[in-house]
Amino acid sequence: MKRPVGLLYSADQVPPPSIVLFSALQHMAAMAVTLVFPIIIAREAGLSAAQQTDVVSLSMLAIGVATILICLRSRFIGSGYLCPAGFTGIYLGPSLFALHLGGLSLVLGMTVVAGLMQFAIAPLLRRLRPLLPPEIAGLVIAIIGLSLAVLGVRYSLGVTESGAIQPAYCAVAGVSLTVMVVLNVWSTGFLKLFCVLIGIATGYAASMLLGLFEVASLAPPEGVGLLHLPDTGHLGWSFDLATLVPFGVAAIAATLRIMGDVSNAQRQDDAEWTRPEFGSITGAVAANGAASAFCGLVGSPGINSYSASVGLAGATGITSRSVGYTAGGIYAALAFVPVAGAAMVSMPAPVIGAVLFFVSAFIFTSGMQMVTARMLDARKSTVIGFSFAMAVMADIYRDVFAAAPELLKPIFDNSLVLGTVCAVLLNLVMRIGVRRRVRLALAAQELEREAVERFLFENGARWAARRDVVSRAVFGVVQVLEVIGTPLG
């Protein structure tokens, strides 16, 4: 393992307490963006303001426990890398479908089922490896980056229902994003480490100046003290086979996403990274499944690794999992502090947009690096290209896909789910006719270098092998043939 240039603290290192704390706060601010998904579910379910506050508090507990589980380093569960958790749009479509079909209890019950499905998939990952190759994981990461960028632009522009853009939102997002980029690119030390946190603070200040944020919004609901045990009276669980397919697809998409995120975390920690280490990935998927089941039990929608935080870790150079433990522990503790929940959900929309847009650049490029590290023939190019195009179309032509059958809407409503499903299915189809073993016969007096190179490179692309591996294979084969036969001409 070789330490990458720009990595300040690796997964196994423990930074000074001050750096751990500020890094954890930075990740917590980024993760707070995902609390919008439980809020959407709570509002769609028609819960009261007090119940919505309880949902946010319970969701903070869930996100804290999930982060600790995924970052944990153990033999059976956890990734061992800084891979914080966050609520995800993957489960939003299936959850809304279940909500309209059977209410909040069906959402929570099927979230538990989806978590158990993901937990059951974990030990089978090695056998499923041919169906989930690294280039597919890279594609999923790239789609996630693109999705975050689209969402970030929407928040930054403050687009209204009529399609109008709000100048104040653009100003706040522009100031916040500029601070993040300038500090990340042209500064060093403390300023570079906490560029996102400083950008967020700047965004809050700009929002207050332009009237987009008021400190009074941080006040807890009337009658609620400083410490408050969330009420669980609104919780219930039910199950319906009609929602099994959408939640199953979401579980598979969540599995691919965390596989990609952990692979990205591994790559950020090792300059000589070549392929995913499946022991770590298996533990991460098991942790994610257990975390999603826990979310369903405490009244939250499904959860997943948070790609933005993985990208944030790479951008700041701090990948220590102790940061994840700290962020998770603080989140779990703040679940019992109502004002903390209000602070998390009151972040101005343009500031959220700036954070999403900033980290999307690192996520997208990481995914594309994983894809382009492999040799791609016509089959693999078709899988990657078609799947990426379908994911883009899901965002551009959302109104068109809204006409899909009700059972398929959870797939077509989400670009990540649609792109993932297309990639997995196309990969299965394109494997037809691909042989695991191939042979090239050469005449003793006609050992041509070009024929050998062409044979190895064509099959390397068919198998999506890394270019450096194929190049070494070509060199080795050529050397052997030069020894046992006529020198290649």
Language model features with spans:
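Hydrophobic transmembrane alpha-helices of multi-pass solute/ion transporters
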Residues: 1-14, 179-182, 196-248, 403-413
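Bergerat-fold GHKL ATPase/HATPase_c domain
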Residues: 431-475
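Membrane-embedded helical hairpins/re-entrant loop segments and their flanking transmembrane helices
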Residues: 8, 15-18, 42-61, 65-78, ...
